[in-house]
A protein has these predicted regions:
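N-terminal presequence-like segments and the immediate start of the first folded domain
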Residues: 1-81, 87-139
Length: 139
C-alpha cells in the first residue's frame, strides 16, 4: 500500500513519543473529521501512571491529552462532537465528581459533546483508571 492509498493522516503532537501500533489521532482525508485514540491519565513523557494517582487527576490528564491531540490536528475543544470514557470503577468516578467537574471546566468550559461512559475491567496501564477517546469535526 502506498502512502497515497491511506485514507487518513496520522497526528502526533509536538514533543510526544510516537506510539507503537496506533496513532494518537487520524484526520480522514477529504473530510474535516478527526478520530482521537483513547488517552489515559499519563502525562506526556511518562512511561506509566504513578501508583496511587487518583481518579480525578487521571481524568484531568486524560482529558487534557485529548485536547492536546485535537489541537495537533488543527482543532479546538469546541470542535469535539463525541467523547467516550472508559473507567475501571464507576463508584470511584462518581466519588471524584468535583475534581472531574473542575477538570472539565478548565479543559472544555461549557462545551458538552455527546458522551458515553462505561465501566471496564482493566485498561492498558495497570494504574489507569480512565481512558477517553473523542471525535471532532473541524470547521
Amino acid at each position: 500500500m502506498s502512502p497515497s492509498d491511506i485514507a487518513y493522516t496520522a497526528v502526533l503532537p509536538d514533543g510526544w513519543t510516537r506510539p507503537r501500533g496506533f496513532s494518537h489521532a487520524v484526520v480522514a482525508k477529504g473530510t474535516k473529521s478527526v478520530r482521537i485514540a483513547g488517552q489515559i491519565g499519563r502525562e506526556p513523557g511518562q512511561s506509566h501512571i504513578p501508583p496511587g494517582t487518583d481518579a480525578g487527576t487521571q481524568w484531568r490528564v486524560a482529558l487534557s491529552n485529548v485536547v492536546t491531540v485535537l489541537k495537533a490536528a488543527g482543532g479546538e475543544p469546541q470542535h469535539l462532537v463525541a467523547l467516550r470514557a472508559y473507567v475501571t470503577d464507576i463508584a470511584e468516578f462518581n466519588a471524584a465528581g468535583a475534581a472531574i467537574g473542575a477538570a472539565w471546566g478548565t479543559t472544555l468550559g461549557k462545551h458538552f459533546p455527546a458522551m458515553t461512559l462505561v465501566q471496564v475491567s482493566a485498561l492498558i496501564d495497570p494504574q489507569a483508571k480512565v481512558e477517553i477517546e473523542g471525535e471532532a469535526i473541524l470547521p
